[in-house]
């Protein structure tokens, strides 16, 4: 049995209030009784007299949507469309409240000529400040555009969409969609690791949903977002066929640009795109090649042997070993050489400084201007 808890008098009062607000038809549904209907009929036939300052219908004043403005879009997208060779640099959010080092690093990179700052989200599943807050802070305090790393792992649909709206409200327009690192390797291995969307699905949600003014359920969100969406790409994958299929799906779902895993052998990267083009045609979207400056022999050996998707040629590892204590300087020289090698076919580079050495990234940017 369905019960309606409110009494007839209350029901009748609001029936008349709805009439005054403009309702053309008022009725009772599940749980209402004949007494409720009689009270409604009486209230509608004999409305109470209005006093001079009585409550009437609520007047709703709609504020016009704020204009998008000339700077609401992605400046990174504009540069890529114009054929500018762009430089993106990854930064990690702080582990606490202090942002002095972060902002100083962003300012250094901006002065060197970085096109955009990429802000990572909980790299290696370590607890850090939320990246969309960092993006807003860097853009406001330093004035350099940012790209928000947006992993799907650990987010349900509610949080995904809420975080996207928050980022857009803070002025973030570039989003780099990734799966994210599993919590098992980080600070809280027992933390929930569930997700509702894979990266390909999130790309579709943003480009075919939010950027058209609707959410995942098809409900309107008002003014459409204007996100410029990047996707991840591994140019030396353990399963080439699967990576090629993922690339095709990401393109079909609307990816605007791609950031690759660190590259140390340009010929391998070029071969990947030749293989894709042979069966699918040109990728047709900007590629920003990952550049991770080597810091020393241990660093190079770790990346080569323990990080999936990264292969460092023997010749480069030999150079780093021979450099000894000058390993960081040799790493910068190798990075500059790699950038010059990919410049003819890439639309930019994505520099990932090791151990927070933003000064080395700035040196690389200065050298390739």
Predicted feature locations:
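Domain-level signal for soluble alpha/beta catalytic cores
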Residues: 1-369
